[in-house]
Amino acid sequence: MNVLLGSVVIFATFVTLCNASCYFIPNEGVPGDSTRKCMDLKGNKHPINSEWQTDNCETCTCYETEISCCTLVSTPVGYDKDNCQRIFKKEDCKYIVVEKKDPKKTCSVSEWII
């Protein structure tokens, strides 16, 4: 079991370094136990094969062996940083890009990253 857990931790670290938009949390317990649930980082329990959205704008899925969480937020990177600024709207889980001098005017964005 320790070897499996160690492998999952190494895999999760590798995935995080390659693609920081998702991460995995090992789901400890006995495989095949259908009464098992996943416990998220806040201590909430979720049924196996369920999906939920976190307060941090992530969507998480409970699997038998792990919880997989991925960001819902795309970050603007291709915009005029001298004249525009990005503002995060947590209630919508998205960024908007507006002019610094007149925040009522939006700026065009050519590139986004997840």
Curated annotation (Swiss-Prot):
Disorder: Prostate cancer, hereditary, 13: A condition associated with familial predisposition to cancer of the prostate. Most prostate cancers are adenocarcinomas that develop in the acini of the prostatic ducts. Other rare histopathologic types of prostate cancer that occur in approximately 5% of patients include small cell carcinoma, mucinous carcinoma, prostatic ductal carcinoma, transitional cell carcinoma, squamous cell carcinoma, basal cell carcinoma, adenoid cystic carcinoma (basaloid), signet-ring cell carcinoma and neuroendocrine carcinoma.
Xref: InterPro entries: PSP94 (IPR008735)
Lineage of the species this protein comes from: Eukaryota, Metazoa, Chordata, Craniata, Vertebrata
Stretches of the chain forming a coiled coil according to its record: none
Subunit structure of this chain's protein: Homodimer; Interacts with PI16.
Record-annotated disulphide pairs: 22-70, 38-62, 57-93, 60-69, 84-107
Protein name: Beta-microseminoprotein
Organism this protein belongs to: Homo sapiens (Human)
Subcellular localization, as worded in the UniProt entry: Secreted
